[in-house]
């Protein structure tokens, strides 16, 4: 298995992977080809794919100069429980450290027991003192997987 930086040419295969994974929480703007292209332009050093003849894993990550954020981590269902997601997270953490980002955050659906267990094993803690809020500035259509 090889892990490398994600490039725009990966988009179709990455999108197919996202669609094969239940509960991804995609939307028509941020996860469109244009949305991902914009994200990769801003974050070329922190987005990765795992390959084994095809793309079997992906992690998107970015930062605002202070804090890193992880988005859309997905592993093909046939390749789960093999340490691939952990390796992708390690790549992101090294990339963030190289960018002098000292902390990383992410959002996981409350109902995603598998994801929440994984992130806990990676050392991510739940912030009981925070309430996550969101406001759409454009009309966004959720894409359920």
Task: State each model region's role.
Residues 62-71, 80, 126-130:
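A conserved beta-turn-beta hairpin within the catalytic core of GNAT-like acetyltransferases
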Residues 96-108:
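Conserved GNAT acetyl-CoA-binding A-motif
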Residues 37-49, 69:
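A short helix-loop-beta-strand connector motif used in the catalytic cores of GNAT acetyltransferases and
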Residues 75, 81-94, 121:
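Conserved acetyl-CoA-binding loop-helix of GNAT-fold acetyltransferases
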Residues 121-122, 131-145:
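Terminal substrate-recognition subdomain of acyl/acetyltransferases
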Residues 1-14:
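A short beta-loop-alpha structural element at the N-terminal edge
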Residues 106-115, 134:
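Conserved beta-strand-loop-alpha-helix junction that forms the acyl-donor binding cleft
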Residues 49, 54-62, 69-74:
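Conserved beta-strand in the GNAT
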